[in-house]
């Protein structure tokens, strides 16, 4: 069984009782900022590399590993712009701040310059009728400037609010898993990893961009890779097995795919008037891939700007977050930004300090961890709307945390705990945990209330060899005042037909592996 830690859970409840005006005070509203486009507008290709960190480079190049698993991307950043200053041999990248450490949060940070603080589950924004109607994002700005915009990915785009956000803020066209099936790009019923693999995504992107460029209209083509998603990624059949571990080979192959795609772009007639931005969407959430790195190493996402319309004014190493990608992307297109700030982001090509440089990383993180009434007002979320309640009741959201509490190797039992239960009112009168094994067999166990710390514990029998399974699905059923109010398949809904249990103790993970 595979396990991983949840990010930002431990401090969430505590911080929701403390408010901060940091975002309100520092936010620069793009709708009230003068933006001047060049006479000839540049095209944009934005590549979100799933879970891609600069950490995957070797230590000699500013990474955290003994061997460089992204050598081509390392060279690409060093040859272009990653805001590392005069020392091009050391990679630089953006910090992922609180409420930006998953895909939709990462995209929102890079295009709106804000953390995705919401009053609903992090991946349930698709249940809302609107997505932060009070903001102006990158897509809005480019749409108003006459850009044709497409977002492509190898999974269903609707998950996590991506479709809602990009439709509302930019009127994007979507080329996703459903589009690929409907248009014969993949066969009906074809399903690999999260939908279809990156090899097919990049081939689709080449055709899409060729067609968009032929219209003469400036374009923004944004794509999100998926092969490198945790847990352990998807290794294409054509990939080289250079390293001893699977995930390193996945990143090494993605490194090859992305840079080959960039090389293809450079041969196209539209390239001279096109800027390419490559960024990790967030640090990897894989359970064990980064466990042996130096604990003092500060992980950052991979960042690279290629063929920018402008050069840096202050050629020193910058300290920045993914918020700064918002104005920096526009600046790379040759857009002049009055004040060089948008959202919480700063134009890194300018000499203006980022908020991280101004306040320090810890101070900024601390403020962003607190509840912001300003963000609640901007979000436009309604946790009482009928669609959201129906989603809670029938489909499930990450409305609680389920994790492995303990494992008894002699009794062949595991204790699963349900904690941090989200509900809108009433009293909890029943909690159970249902485990579905890959063979379809199920166990449903009533959880007992541990009053000392508020969690609910359920002891499940795994003597049938369940620990040998690669993954098992876990549902927590929570009844509020005798009505079935919540059902949560703890891990993200789009994790295919399986989910995995997060574990907060690597020792337990090792125990299970050794017992299987």
Q: Where in the sequence are the language-model features?
A:
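Surface-exposed, short loops/turns at beta-strand junctions within beta-sandwich domains
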Residues: 461-473
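Aromatic sugar-binding surface patches on proteins
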Residues: 450-463
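Metal-dependent active-site segment of extracytoplasmic phospho-/sulfohydrolases and closely related
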Residues: 253-292, 330, 336
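Solvent-exposed serine/threonine-rich low-complexity stretches and specific carbohydrate-binding patches
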Residues: 441-453
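Membrane-interface soluble catalytic domains
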Residues: 140, 157-166, 309-434, 468, ...
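Substrate-binding rim/cap in mid-to-C-terminal beta-strand-loop elements of soluble/periplasmic
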Residues: 105-118, 293-335
């Amino acid at each position: 069984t595979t396990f991983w830690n949840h990010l930002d859970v431990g401090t969430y409840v505590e911080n929701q009782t403390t408010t901060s005006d940091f975002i309100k005070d520092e936010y620069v509203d793009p709708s009230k900022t003068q933006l001047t486009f060049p006479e000839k507008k540049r095209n944009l290709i934005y590549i979100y590399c799933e879970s891609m960190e600069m950490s995957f480079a070797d230590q000699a190049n500013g990474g955290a590993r003994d061997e460089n698993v992204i050598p081509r991307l390392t060279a690409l950043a060093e040859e272009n712009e990653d805001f590392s200053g005069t020392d091009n041999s050391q990679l630089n990248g953006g910090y992922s701040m609180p409420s930006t450490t998953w895909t939709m949060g990462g995209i929102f940070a890079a295009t709106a310059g804000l953390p995705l603080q919401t009053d609903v589950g992090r991946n349930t924004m698709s249940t809302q009728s609107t997505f932060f109607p009070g903001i102006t994002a990158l897509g809005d700005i480019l749409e108003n400037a006459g850009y044709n915009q497409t977002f492509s990915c190898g999974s269903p785009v609707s998950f996590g609010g991506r479709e809602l956000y990009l439709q509302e803020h930019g009127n994007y066209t979507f080329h996703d898993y459903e589009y690929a099936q409907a248009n014969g790009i993949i066969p009906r019923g074809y399903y690999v990893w999260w939908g279809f693999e990156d090899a097919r995504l990049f081939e689709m992107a080449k055709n899409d961009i060729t067609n968009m460029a032929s219209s003469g209209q400036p374009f923004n083509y944004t794509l999100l890779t998926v092969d490198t998603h945790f847990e352990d990624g998807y290794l294409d059949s054509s990939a080289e097995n250079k390293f001893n571990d699977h995930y390193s080979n996945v990143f090494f192959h993605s490194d090859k795919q992305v840079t080959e795609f960039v090389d293809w772009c450079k041969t196209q007639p539209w390239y001279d008037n096109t800027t390419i931005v490559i960024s990790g969407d967030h640090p990897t959430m894989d359970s064990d891939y980064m466990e042996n790195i130096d604990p003092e190493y500060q992980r950052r996402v991979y960042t690279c700007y290629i063929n920018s319309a402008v050069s840096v004014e202050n050629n020193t190493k910058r300290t920045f977050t993914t918020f700064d990608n918002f104005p920096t992307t526009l600046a790379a297109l040759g857009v002049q930004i009055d004040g060089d700030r948008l959202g919480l982001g700063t134009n890194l090509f300018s000499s203006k300090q980022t908020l991280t440089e101004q306040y320090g990383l810890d101070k900024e993180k601390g403020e962003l961890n607190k509840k912001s009434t300003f963000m609640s007002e901007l979000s436009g979320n309604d946790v009482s709307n009928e669609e959201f309640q129906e989603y809670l009741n029938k489909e499930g959201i990450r409305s609680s945390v389920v994790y492995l509490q303990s494992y008894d190797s002699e009794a062949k039992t595991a204790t699963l705990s349900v904690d941090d239960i989200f509900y809108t009112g009433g009293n909890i009168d029943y909690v159970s945990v249902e485990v579905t094994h890959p063979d379809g067999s199920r166990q449903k166990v009533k959880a007992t209330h541990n009053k000392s710390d508020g969690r609910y514990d359920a002891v499940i029998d795994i003597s049938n060899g369940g620990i040998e399974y690669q993954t098992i699905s876990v549902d927590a059923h929570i009844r509020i005042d005798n009505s079935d109010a919540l059902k949560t398949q703890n891990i993200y809904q789009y994790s295919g037909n399986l989910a995995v249990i997060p574990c907060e103790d690597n020792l337990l993970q090792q125990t299970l592996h050794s017992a299987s």
